[in-house]
Amino acid sequence: NNNAMFNLSYGLFVLTSQLNGKDNGCIVNTVTQVTVSPNQIAVAVNKQNLTHDMIKVSGVFNVSILSEKSKFATYKHWGMQSGTDTDKLEAITYKRSANGLVYIEDEANAFISAKVVNKIDLGTHTLFIAEVTDCEVISEDPSVTYAYYHKNIKEVPQAKTEAKKGFICVICGYIYEG
């Protein structure tokens, strides 16, 4: 029963990068510290995300660790639209870290800046192993977990009277109707 995978404990994050002067970001749920010395993290990113391609070329990224105060609109903004179709920095509040990349502060409790030192091809995703170059605590608010998101933040889709073809993403709840 693959539902057992939902019992793994992990957070939700805004992953940002930049390439050729264009900033972008997406929601990811797989960021973890893998070593303390050197301080390294790993992040798995879907190859279909523009942010993936930016990180693959630029070799740098930021992770904003979302807190329990985060709103569904944040997940919708960063995770339910493509950076190829929209400017994700338009009409949002953000800051830049020492590496020049964007991080969000309002709904995050910390950010981490990192430089890629290794890449592992996982088929649909790439696992980026990266050395932490900067990190900062923003607030003491608890980090949002995937379980907390589903119980307290995620909006339940309204029932439709007309059936449409599509799918619902099991990770973020995004509904694609084609």
Model regions and ranges:
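Basic, polyanion-binding surface patches
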Residues: 1-164
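Short cysteine-rich clusters marking metal-coordination/redox-active sites
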Residues: 169-172
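Cys/His-rich metal-chelating microdomains
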Residues: 175-178
